[in-house]
């Protein structure tokens, strides 16, 4: 993704929107001369809204990892496709989705995947102080309510 972006920029393209497999890389502005507006999918089953929230991007990348699309259902239990590297077993987490903004797709995708296997508290501790990473979490609490948390500058350009 980042190679495609750089290749197009070298050839004079200024306003770019590239999406491959859920990773997004934007440059410049949309056709109305404004920042690109990207929808973050709702991880809530049977939700009336398919978009949970939107974020504006300018000259940045966005990647989202979630447990709501790729899972195995066995005996009424959803088994997450994210694997804990320490145990080799599927992660059990209340985190439903993590979206990461970064200056490139490589970092955004890697951090979205890494944060997906951590709790919110573990994840926010890992990325605090990293200026190039902003993140947005969607998770469920112990009562099944859907909540969101995000870093200070996630919604800023």
Functional labels for PLM-detected ranges:
Residues 1-157:
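Mature catalytic core of soluble alpha/beta enzymes
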